[in-house]
């Protein structure tokens, strides 16, 4: 990571006085509220509700080995994927937290076929936010104790929306319309990282006081990284341009940080978080079996794309900017190339059959 950040935090044996050097998430939101174009108390409360749900999920994650929350529910979600018990639990916690708060009128979740209406829309401005999320990304890794995460994206109802009952179609907005996005990574420590379009900031949960504390202010990702994250087991099902790019990454050239180091956990949040801080590219391309890609545009690619761009990186489907894609359904899939800008632009050039443009970059 090239931006400055604190590397220790209260709860690691630091004196109590050191707490004064840290800012809580709630304090940070209130301090920045005036610089946010949609500044309202409702938005601040919405972020508080999301962070509360994340704390509850984190608590249950820490006790997963002692509770009956490993394994699957025996059911499949709308994606056709086997639903893990922690998937269902995390979905329930986020829905309950957002329903209690009243700031969110619609929630779209990976675990539910349609957007869920949560509240009516008031003329005073309450209930005008839409939250799209993957409640627990990488949940198949839980029973082997690998880091997992939550991804969320926040929109407002379109200007001029007059209906009291929220229309699920209102959730289908391009990523450029996001007012905030973030993720939580449940790892050796629990971090919440988010943006409102004014940079990216990270907060580490101090379990001793139950607060997210600012630990990574103004995150900037290196423009050129050395990490490559992709499931290379599908190499022979990738299109030729991508295979050429992967081969190029493994050639030795210190001037362009090659050969790249391959790091792939299989948990999108964890892989993205590492590459955001250290510099690299995460790739989940189209394959023969998934020609439209595998990741979901609305609650995986768009929020992470917003964060990547705000940190100085880039996000593309290989041919165009992710945030500009027009959605036609909640669970729409997309290929994704995201991370350090120079690496994403080179990947695009190879995919578009212009390797000479990549080599001259």
Curated annotation (Swiss-Prot):
Its EC number is 3.1.3.11. It is found in: Cytoplasm. Gene3D superfamilies: 3.40.190.80, Fructose-1,6-Bisphosphatase, subunit A, domain 1. Binds 2 magnesium ions per subunit. Pathway: Carbohydrate biosynthesis; gluconeogenesis. GO terms for cellular component: cytosol. Keywords: Carbohydrate metabolism, Cytoplasm, Hydrolase, Magnesium, Metal-binding. One of its GO terms (molecular function) is magnesium ion binding. The keyword Hydrolase applies. Its cofactor is Mg(2+). Mg(2+) 2 binds at residues 134, 137, 300. It comes from the Bacteria. Mg(2+) 1 binds at residues 110, 134, 136. InterPro entries: FBPase_C_dom (IPR044015), FBPase_class-1 (IPR000146), FBPase_N (IPR033391), FBPtase (IPR028343). NCBIfam families: PRK09293.1-1 (NF006778). Homotetramer. Belongs to the FBPase class 1 family. This is Fructose-1,6-bisphosphatase class 1 2. The gene is fbp2.
């Amino acid at each position: 990571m090239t931006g400055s950040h604190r590397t220790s935090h209260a709860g690691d044996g630091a004196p109590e006085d050191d707490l004064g050097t840290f800012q809580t998430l709630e304090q940070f939101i209130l301090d920045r509220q005036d610089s946010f174009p949609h500044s309202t108390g409702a938005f601040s409360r919405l972020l508080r509700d999301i962070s509360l749900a994340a704390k509850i999920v984190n608590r249950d994650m820490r006790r997963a080995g002692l509770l009956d929350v490993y394994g699957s529910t025996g059911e499949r979600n709308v994606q056709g994927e086997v639903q893990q018990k922690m998937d269902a639990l995390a979905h329930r916690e986020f829905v309950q937290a957002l329903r209690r708060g009243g700031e969110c009128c619609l929630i779209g979740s990976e675990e539910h076929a349609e957007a869920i209406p949560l509240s009516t829309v008031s003329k005073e401005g309450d209930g005008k936010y839409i939250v799209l999320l993957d409640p627990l990304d990488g949940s198949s890794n839980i029973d082997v104790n690998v880091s997992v995460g939550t991804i969320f994206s926040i929109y407002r109802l379109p200007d001029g929306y007059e209906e009291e009952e929220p229309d699920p179609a209102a959730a289908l907005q391009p990523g450029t319309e996001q007012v905030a996005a973030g993720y939580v990574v449940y790892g050796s420590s629990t971090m919440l990282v988010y943006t409102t379009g004014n940079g990216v900031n990270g907060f580490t949960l101090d379990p001793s006081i139950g607060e997210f504390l600012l630990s990574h202010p103004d995150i900037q990702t290196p423009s050129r990284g050395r990490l490559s994250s992709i499931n290379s087991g599908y190499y022979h099902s990738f299109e030729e341009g991508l295979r050429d790019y992967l081969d190029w990454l493994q050639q030795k050239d210190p001037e362009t940080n090659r050969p790249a180091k391959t790091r792939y956990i299989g948990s999108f949040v964890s892989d993205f978080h590492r590459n955001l801080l250290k510099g690299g590219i995460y790739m989940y391309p189209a394959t023969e079996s998934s020609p439209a890609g595998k990741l979901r545009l609305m609650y995986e690619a768009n929020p992470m794309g917003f964060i990547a761009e705000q940190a100085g990186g880039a996000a593309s489907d290989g041919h165009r900017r992710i945030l500009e894609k027009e959605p036609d359904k909640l669970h729409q899939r997309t290929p994704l190339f995201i991370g350090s800008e120079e690496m994403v632009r080179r990947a695009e050039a190879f995919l578009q059959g212009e390797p000479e443009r990549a080599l001259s970059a």
